[in-house]
């Protein structure tokens, strides 16, 4: 009975988060369509995506990634004590300490944007030093970084607020908040960029304004929940010390994939023009199912696992992990295979207009195919990593994270030499698989979680259904030349039909194999 209650509660929370995330992701795709039409995949696009990736990397490293994974278990522990004053004091001291640190980092980024660009865009910097053809990229990237870097400050507090609200069971607010970034970027792309000599500056301003609006949006909900407090410096506060202790190793453990993506940008700055853009558009399509399913499930599973750990409920902990694994594989397998088969049609329908050419579709499809092969690994990492952080164990995943990161660097050097930017995507996917495998192995060896026979059989049936779905899609898929001969309406209708065919065939085979909705609940074996 317990596992049924857990599954229903988590499923309800997961649906809420997924619904809010869906709105944000759809608007994110609209934003990317607008950006592709405005800039395509040329030099300007490369520079903007570079300038936007660095603060986003730091956001996931400090805010949504390591900080949230360290903060939520500690906050859950304080909240479970029932002492609201103690909880409010922890929030005040954590926000004050984090605020000082992120302000310093933001100032360094803005004032030292040239140095940051030289560090992560070394290829452009060397061209600038030698008066090469990419010298203008370095100067523009430094300018854009000055505008986009303050986004880190805003979004850090957005992530902090979201972690607090999620711990209190209010998942919808934080899941809906990213909508405002997409809205501001779309508005700036439509109304500001066309009136500027450098359109990418308008997009950078959109990033800044998006962060500001997200920050302001969550304040009323914090007030209503009674947790909007005045920040205090608390470096040596016991709660903050515990968060720091958990956070430092988590900087690697939870953000390895982001470090890998940033390293991809570093290597890509030495490659042909368009490489960063092709990788970006591929990553954006990958992020849609990853955010809609993987991150949404991870968002609700971390507080749940933390509560089970505080209550010393080992069975509940395992049931929650099992639910996460089943949901991620049920959704992730068809998403991964669908992206791989429909890479070119999706890129055509979404991005091929304005400055984004058929050649860009061809190039981006190769990196999307490579990235997509790692989608299930990325999603499983989002579920497996909280299995450590909820127990306040950050040292184990950091070891695995370092191994995966080093493997990515080595594989980058090998594959980029032979396959260019596509090799970077292949290396990222392979290192993600390694990280995922190590995380599961660690949980198994610690006796915390192991796959039951029922879950293994469940996943095997998902794989069989996915194989049939892939065959059905390939059977109906026309050549790229045929797709190019169609208008946008026919492309969109055909893609919609193919997606419908994929979903229908996947679910039909699952039904024939005996899979039912009740199988998505945690195994009790």
Curated annotation (Swiss-Prot):
A GO molecular-function term, please? lipid-linked peptidoglycan transporter activity
Q: What UniProt keywords apply to this chain's record, in alphabetical order?
A: Cell inner membrane, Cell membrane, Cell shape, Cell wall biogenesis/degradation, Membrane, Peptidoglycan synthesis, Transmembrane, Transmembrane helix, Transport
Would you say which domain of life the source belongs to? Answer: Bacteria
Q: How does it sit in the membrane?
A: Multi-pass membrane protein
Q: Name one Pfam family in it.
A: MurJ
Localization terms from the record: Cell inner membrane
GO annotations of cellular component type: plasma membrane
Q: Does the keyword Membrane apply?
A: yes
Please name the GO terms of the biological process aspect recorded for this protein, alphabetically: cell wall organization; lipid translocation; lipid-linked peptidoglycan transport; peptidoglycan biosynthetic process; regulation of cell shape
Q: Does the keyword Glycosyltransferase apply?
A: no
UniProt lists the family membership as follows: Belongs to the MurJ/MviN family.
The record ties this protein, via NCBIfam families, to: murJ_mviN (TIGR01695)
* This protein's name: Probable lipid II flippase MurJ
Per the UniProt record, the source organism is: Vibrio cholerae serotype O1 (strain ATCC 39315 / El Tor Inaba N16961)
């Amino acid at each position: 009975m317990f596992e049924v209650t857990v599954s229903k509660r988590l499923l309800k929370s997961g649906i809420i988060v997924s619904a809010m995330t869906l709105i944000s992701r759809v608007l994110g795709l609209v934003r990317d369509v607008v950006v592709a039409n405005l800039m395509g995949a040329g030099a300007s696009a490369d520079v903007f995506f570079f300038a936007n990736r660095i603060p986003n990397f730091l956001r996931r490293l400090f805010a949504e990634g390591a900080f949230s994974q360290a903060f939520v278990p500690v906050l859950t522990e304080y909240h479970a004590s029932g002492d609201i004053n103690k909880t409010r004091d922890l929030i005040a001291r954590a926000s004050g300490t984090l605020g000082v640190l992120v302000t310093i980092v933001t100032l360094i980024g803005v004032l030292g944007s040239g140095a940051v660009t030289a560090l992560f865009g070394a290829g452009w910097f060397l061209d600038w030093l030698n008066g090469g053809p990419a010298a203008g990229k370095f100067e523009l990237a430094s300018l854009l970084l000055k505008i986009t870097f303050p986004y880190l400050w805003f979004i850090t507090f957005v992530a902090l607020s979201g972690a607090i609200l999620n711990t209190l069971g209010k998942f919808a607010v934080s899941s809906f908040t990213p909508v405002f970034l997409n809205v501001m970027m779309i508005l700036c792309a439509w109304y500001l960029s066309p009136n500027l000599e450098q359109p990418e500056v308008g997009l950078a301003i959109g990033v800044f304004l998006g962060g500001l609006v997200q920050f302001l949006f969550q304040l009323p909900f914090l007030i209503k929940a009674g947790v909007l407090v005045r920040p205090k410096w608390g470096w040596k506060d016991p709660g903050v010390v515990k968060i720091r202790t958990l956070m430092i190793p988590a900087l690697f453990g939870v953000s390895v994939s982001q470090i890998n993506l940033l390293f991809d940008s570093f290597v890509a700055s030495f490659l042909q023009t368009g490489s960063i853009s092709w990788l970006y558009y591929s990553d954006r399509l990958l992020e849609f199912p990853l955010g809609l399913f993987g991150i949404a499930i991870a968002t609700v599973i971390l507080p749940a696992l933390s509560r089970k750990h505080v209550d010393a409920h080992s069975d509940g902990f395992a049931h929650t992990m099992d639910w996460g694994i089943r949901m991620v594989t049920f959704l992730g397998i068809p998403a991964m295979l669908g992206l791989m088969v429909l890479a070119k049609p999706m890129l055509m329908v979404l991005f091929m207009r304005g400055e984004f050419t058929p050649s860009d579709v061809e190039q981006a499809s190769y990196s999307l195919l490579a990235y997509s092969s790692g989608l299930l690994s990325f999603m499983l990492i989002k579920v497996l990593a909280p299995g450590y952080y909820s127990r306040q164990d950050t040292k184990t995943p950091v070891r695995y994270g370092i191994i995966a990161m080093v493997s990515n660097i080595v594989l980058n050097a090998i594959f980029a030499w032979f396959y260019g930017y596509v090799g970077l995507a292949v290396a990222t996917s392979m290192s993600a698989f390694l990280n995922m495998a190590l995380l599961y192995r660690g949980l198994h060896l610690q006796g915390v979680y192991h796959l039951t026979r029922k879950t293994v059989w469940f996943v095997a049936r998902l794989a069989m259904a996915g194989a049939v779905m892939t065959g059905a899609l390939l059977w109906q898929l026309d050549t790229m030349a045929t797709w190019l001969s169609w208008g946008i309406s026919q492309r969109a209708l055909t893609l919609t039909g193919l997606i419908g065919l994929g979903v229908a065939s996947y679910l039909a085979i699952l039904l024939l194999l005996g899979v039912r909705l009740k199988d998505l609940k945690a195994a009790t074996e």
